[in-house]
């Protein structure tokens, strides 16, 4: 039997997800980090959700891009299911306030750690499928989460990571390359949370956060690109 809390910490979570659970304990399990319990946590649901997400996104890309080859479709899928993309969806769903973490994990900033947020999104996908046993319903829910991002995915240059795109943008205009500075590291390896500032001549300082220095730099670069596109 799954051990659960009596109610969700955020009663509006199901509305944001777009699904009302028949077995609320499945959603609670999907929100429970292994730091709380080695037996009752989201890892099995995450395993299932990871496979389901890959299939849903692969099917969408196959239908939406009938003339793209396998290599480009694979790279597009990787862009949409990587940790950075799932972290953005977690933020859209406001999952950080709903995570069930140990006191130690909470103090180390686990509720903002991109890897945990991404894992939780996959676990929720698995939980919805187990609860509903309806793949078509799950597909519609997941693609609705992805609406803000599907329109911006391109088979070509958008597949490059934000740091590469920013560097190419500046080089093409003969401007100085960006400088990345780590300003804060929380927690202990391997569960660290990094804050990195990206400095570009003529633009305000922009901060990015992530579960690794690389992810934090990519997040900061993505924010700089948004400023340049305005």
UniProtKB/Swiss-Prot annotation:
> Which biological process terms from the Gene Ontology are attached to this UniProt entry?
mRNA processing; rRNA processing; tRNA processing
* Keyword flag Transmembrane helix: no
Positions binding Mg(2+) in this chain are: 46, 119, 122
Task: Kindly identify the residues recorded as the active site.
Answer: 50, 122
Q: What cofactors are annotated for this protein? A: Mg(2+)
Identify the residues that the record assigns to the RNase III domain, covering every copy.
10-133
EC number(s): the record gives: 3.1.26.3
The record's section on Pfam families has: dsrm (PF00035), Ribonucleas_3_3 (PF14622)
Q: Which reaction does it catalyse?
A: Endonucleolytic cleavage to 5'-phosphomonoester
One annotated Gene Ontology cellular component of this protein: cytoplasm
Tell me which SUPFAM superfamilies the record gives.
dsRNA-binding domain-like, RNase III domain-like
Q: Which GO terms describe its molecular function?
A: metal ion binding; ribonuclease III activity; rRNA binding
Quaternary structure? Homodimer.
Q: Which family does it belong to?
A: Belongs to the ribonuclease III family.
What name does UniProt use for this protein?
Answer: Ribonuclease 3
Organism whose genome encodes this protein: Acinetobacter baylyi (strain ATCC 33305 / BD413 / ADP1)
